[in-house]
Amino acid sequence: MKGDGIPDYQTCTRYVYVPGHFKKVIYRLHRFTQDGKVFEPKTPPAVFMNSSYTSSFVAGLLQLRYMYAMPAERIIHYFEDQGFNLKKPTAGFLLGRAAETLENFYKAIRKAVLSDDYIASDETYFKILVPEKNSKGKGVKKGYFWVIVGRESGLLYAVCRDGSRAGDVIYDELHDYHGTMHSDAASFYRKIQCDDFPNITRIACLQHIKRKFIDCMDTEPEAKEMVKLINKLYHENHKHKIGENSWTVEDNFKWRQQYAPAILAEIKDKLNEILKKPDLLPDSELSDAASYFNNEWEAVVDIFKRGDTALDNNLVERMNRYFSMSRRSSLFFGSHKGAERAAVLYTLALSAKMNHLNLFDYLADILDRTAKWQPNTPLEKYRNLLPDRWQPSTED
């Protein structure tokens, strides 16, 4: 520092990229003999039996595959560029064993999600290689993941059953469920409103409804008015956020009781006006939007009977983008078994994402912690290691 108070140095910043690197650690394990008996040394722990790969390697592989949507072949080339030769069968082995090892975490997440009082569901498609040829002569079939999110726990559960989109898949998951479920108006979801599911209240997605009016509002003034009315609900809903400034679920419910009835009545009047228009063409976009909204009306009103419900199902749709990223990158799964394995790993990856965890850190930690747990370990023991409760290990 100079006498005039001016520093005699200045600082500047340069950012350096250091590519990922791999370590090959060789242990020298000593045998010893006592009283004529040879004692073999214990080998360092490995995440999988008969494998030389550590939890960090497996966690890195899973992060690239299921968070960054890199297909296995691309990961192999990426590793090659960094000086490591990973064979494709080895990559497949590690991914498969990871799914098997994390199976109990998957089951524990399912149990936690379906214990949540408020869930949301959607489905998304993928392509799968099958022996049978389709009409175009290709052995490719469209399959589906069903996604259920626990809105209170922030955990995500993905299920794939032979790629089926039949309602039985979701019905089997929900047959004992008690609570509120958010979804769009696909027929298999609307069936949940019937007497077969007396303990479930299905609520609608206002964004799905609004999009239908947006699609025709350039040519239909009534559609533009309806969009403005729906936006009034969003405007009032955004004035407060649960957890901020001591705002509680009960506060939010009371606030909804104040603003929602008048706006909903205004919307219902406009909806009836559209439906009764003498010149409304049955096959028009406006007619389709109004009919869709009218069929969902009860499920819309039910949104405002709780203080903690969202106005739409956008959270699940955002999570589904990770499936679509993989779909665009990988093109297909090699088999139904591969898709079911992916459901396990996506469940862990996206649950970690929803809880703002670094997937690499999370997976490396839980793989190490549970390496010696038996397959029949009670699911309750996994509960505090799920992403919504996990705390990093304090062990060295």
For each predicted feature, which ranges?
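Basic, low-complexity segments
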Residues: 1-51
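Catalytic center-proximal scaffold of phosphoryl-transfer enzymes
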Residues: 29-33, 38-396
